[in-house]
Amino acid sequence: MAVNIIATRAAPKMASKKEHQYCLLDSQEKRHGHYPFSFELKPYGQTGANIIGVQGSLTHVIKMTVFPFMIPFPLQKTHIDDFIGGRIYLFFKELDMQAVSDVNGMQYHFEFKVVPVSPNQVELLPVNNKYKFTYAIPVVQYLTPIFYDLSGPLDFPLDTLSVHVDSLSNHIQLPIQNHNLTTGDRVFISGYKHLQTIELCKNNKIFIKYIPPLSSEKIKLYIPKNRIRIPLYFKSLKNV
């Protein structure tokens, strides 16, 4: 019995190259109205004004790398022993279709070892700092990081507050009660170029030795110890 063999030509493969993009998710540049964190990544943009700038577009992402970084103690924790198992997990909401699932059904992209650094901060050391996607992510425009441990999601103290300043009595009225500011903390007041030291902290008022005259009574108070910066490195596959 004769067999007909039909020869076919394979479709030519598109040549591809790998591009690398570095970005720093800075909590002071999070999107307005999104708590606790949500970031917009803008191609060829400049970091600032609530934008995280990247050199090129984040398309066809095949791998994501994270590096060690610092975080303040979450609101749910007061001591290093409060971190169950000494681990924290990081999950990106927009990438939920591809993530690691643990035995409890919780998803994450990175696992970290928690290392104490000071009474206010811990360092997160990646257990495995690379996550490879099974299928390339078409585009990454927004990233919403969610932190949790085995007890559940973790919330963090704010790193920026809108405050009322009284230059005559050298005190600042804080809009919240559950802040983590204490005497001796360093803060930055918008409109003034130097860090200030808190002389006294009483309820939701902080007193500073010298507050310069400011053009507006309602200004921004930046709290360096609460700032979170997540360093990420993306690898993309581009057709050429």
From Swiss-Prot:
Its main location: virion. Induction: Expressed in the late phase of the viral replicative cycle. Keywords: Late protein, Virion. It is found in: Virion. The keyword Membrane does not apply. The keyword Thylakoid does not apply. GO terms for cellular component: virion component. Forms the penton at the fivefold vertices of the icosahedral capsid. Together with the minor capsid proteins (p17, p49, and M1249L), forms a complicated network immediately below the outer capsid shell, stabilizing the whole capsid. Belongs to the asfivirus H240R family. This is Penton protein H240R. It comes from African swine fever virus (strain Badajoz 1971 Vero-adapted).
